[in-house]
Amino acid sequence: MRHYEIIHTEDTRGFHVVFSVTPEECHLRDCFDLTETELIDLCEKIDRGIYAWFNARVEVYQQGILLGSDFLGGCLYDAPMTFVKESEYYDDMVKNAIQEATYNLEKLYESRNEVTA
């Protein structure tokens, strides 16, 4: 089981959003078309903490219940917060997770109405 570190939380559109990361297990050579020299240089910079190489996760909650999520692997940034503040991926992930949460809420309400009808 992977351990995720919470990096950022926010409340938006009636949902509590949690952004967390875990180290990427995939090797850089499997994700980028780099020369051997570029690959070695980049790996050294990751090892020294100059860059962060991670999987990103966005989870969306309402009243403490997980209703939606989105994941993205192969993220290479100066820091995970750079991903939040400067990439378009973070906003897309939040949007996708909220769409899933909204869908799940609608299904729950529908099934609840069927039970009580």
For each predicted feature, which ranges?
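Acidic interaction surfaces
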Residues: 1-117
